[in-house]
């Protein structure tokens, strides 16, 4: 008998159907060991040696798996192919006393081909990944265990601070400060509604842009009225008509981050809900008539890379369903973001023959909606570009120049499969302009001045915050949903519609951390820590170094905060400072 251990029963059920009777597939239910719940569990003086204990609720699981492993001729550890998965396998190896009688297997998708290929090419646990996870866990424990009690003494209540959550909270607080301190400024625009003298009744808009070649600024009504007076009674003449063909590029396939962003924007799903459903699609579901199958590849990835086999299948599907003109001459290849680990493919369907429509009656509503989003995004990523006829017209009135732009789609390309985002759609057919010639005179229908005011920066949504966290290198895409969930749970932030706002408690916590622990809330510092963890994983850097570099100065700040800390209630001054 051979034993395969995975994290979840759903994943076990999917894998079991692909292996023969010689295999037993069982689940650990995630981590079986961790640092102790009621003690720090780290010997700082002994090079940050961690003390791992088996979760009380996992004692029976460990006993069961240990019994099976003793009977097995071979044990395969098949946890997820990332830091956390590697750490789970390492803890299982130690808790079960496997010594060298194990193999580590990984797959990017749970399919018969992928599982059997992994069985045929077993490896061993990658200690660089384990050490990166250990370093992160110890860092987070040190910060949480030592800093949270300080917050509780300073501010009433059971509070927590975290290495990543606090930096994310500060971004939200800072944006709220920007909005509250924003002073709107008046400005004006002037729009001419024009049409041809003959041959067309189309009225189109042109916006005043410059005077004597310099961009014009109209700060008030007086300046605007003066310009309107100068424009009176003068001809509107076409100075130039510039036509061009422009292209709309298809979007890349999803990464963990972009899936969460798009699911929030298009489906209105919270990031934690998106990840829960995506996990179900990855691990496998019982589908009527199909059995227990997985639908998408591994969902924790920052890569847009796709296998040659999957790319070829996408191109074949496009040709069959939409015609050859929707297939570009060469496959679309996308560059992954800077600092992406690129260990896994992008998120994509495992089997393109399982279309969303064919599964609609077999999936729950949100499972169907998310699968449809992933399926269509992947297919569109290999489709041809959208094509537009664009026209830019400059119209003169004396020294003044007006601009009018129009864009008409001539080939829908990828947009036939995957609807463009609202901001892209806004640019299409934005002004219907009749055929015009240089030097042609136009008739003015009306001249419309409009008072406007500058707007404050927008509040973050879950989608825009996740994008910012990724751009700044705060956390990893796989942790973004957890970061947000923690901030909600601690009542540091709240939602107003789709917008994120800090609570008074969140503001107060940030003010205190800025004063005594600025590194913890500094985005650049947090990003450098993430880079250090990446170096442990990718280059085998010494994992103790990042802890030795971080902890001594952090401990001094803890001592400083405690030395001047006699319990004080939150004061009006604290709240006022948070709003400055």
How does the language model describe each region?
Residues 572-574, 578-580:
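Positively charged, low-complexity/disordered segments
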Residues 136-145, 249-256, 276-290, 334-352, ...:
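Core structural elements
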Residues 114-187:
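C-terminal or mid-to-C-terminal helical accessory/interaction module adjacent to the motor/catalytic core
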Residues 260-270, 467-476:
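Short helix-coil junctions and helix-kink-helix linkers
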Residues 154, 175-219, 266:
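C-terminal helical "lid" subdomain and adjoining coupling/linker elements of P-loop NTPases
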Residues 217-252:
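Metal- or metallocofactor-binding catalytic centers and their adjacent structured scaffolds
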Residues 1-137, 146:
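Intrinsically disordered, low-complexity regulatory segments
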Residues 2, 14, 23, 148, ...:
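Basic, low-complexity terminal or inter-domain segments flanking catalytic cores
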